[in-house]
Amino acid sequence: MESENIISAADKARILAEALPYIRRFSGSVAVIKYGGNAMTEPALKEGFARDVVLLKLVGIHPVIVHGGGPQINAMLEKVGKKGEFVQGMRVTDKEAMDIVEMVLGGHVNKEIVSMINTYGGHAVGVSGRDDHFIKAKKLLIDTPEQNGVDIGQVGTVESIDTGLVKGLIERGYIPVVAPVGVGEKGEAFNINADLVAGKLAEELNAEKLLMMTNIAGVMDKMGNLLTKLTPKRIDELIADGTLYGGMLPKIASAVEAAVNGVKATHIIDGRLPNALLLEIFTDAGIGSMILGGGEDA
């Protein structure tokens, strides 16, 4: 594989020189990273992600991690003999399932990410949206072809985010790692799509960047070519002609909404590539798709 080729000393020097203006430009800014897909499950990619996050912090960027955990939740539900059920791609989450979701996301997955970042020299702290009730949620009702407003249990959408807790951690030099669990008006837990939480958090933090790690190269056209720079108008065209559909739509919607609402740029990148974060942020070409809030496509 190309990623396994040995990089010469000259190439390393060139890469560092190319990165320097980006380091200067983004130092002091916030980058919200949605962490999911293969990058969360393959040991080498998990270690590489942790190292990259620590490096971002070392060069003055403030990373904030929002993670998923679908495969880990499925594995635990299977272990306890509870079958997963989905409506329109959303997990049906009754009280028993929510207890398991919260245990897996806020316990195992969150703490594993925190531990790995800290192992490589970072100072990460894990939080859930229920901590300080900083992510307020409301029940999400799903429309299906047969019925509108289907109740799928303790699945929520973001009602509001109080960034005080996260900003306080950043100001003290920590790397916040956020489990996407929100709290309802009665104190009940809600499972929230991690892409949605990442997008809303990036907006509220006035982040320079929102980076969504996926198992695809980025946004592709009908011919399978990577579209490296997009605007909301172009995204609408790709949805209208059927190029974008299915499970990609919620991710795209969160990315576009963040870009429109003040995040300087949102990026959809291939988390299966080693050093994906660094390649997207610190190289001229990047590796994924960048969505800008306005202007013309490049």
From Swiss-Prot:
This is Acetylglutamate kinase. It comes from Neisseria meningitidis serogroup C / serotype 2a (strain ATCC 700532 / DSM 15464 / FAM18). GO terms for cellular component: cytoplasm. Coiled coil: none annotated. HAMAP family: ArgB. The record marks 34, 251 as: Transition state stabilizer. It catalyses: N-acetyl-L-glutamate + ATP = N-acetyl-L-glutamyl 5-phosphate + ADP. Its main location: cytoplasm. Its EC number is 2.7.2.8. The keyword NADP does not apply. Belongs to the acetylglutamate kinase family. ArgB subfamily. One of its GO terms (molecular function) is acetylglutamate kinase activity. PANTHER family: N-ACETYLGLUTAMATE SYNTHASE (PTHR23342), N-ACETYLGLUTAMATE SYNTHASE, MITOCHONDRIAL (PTHR23342:SF0). It is an enzyme of class 2 (transferase). It is found in: Cytoplasm. Pathway: Amino-acid biosynthesis; L-arginine biosynthesis; N(2)-acetyl-L-ornithine from L-glutamate: step 2/4. The keyword rRNA-binding does not apply. The gene is argB.
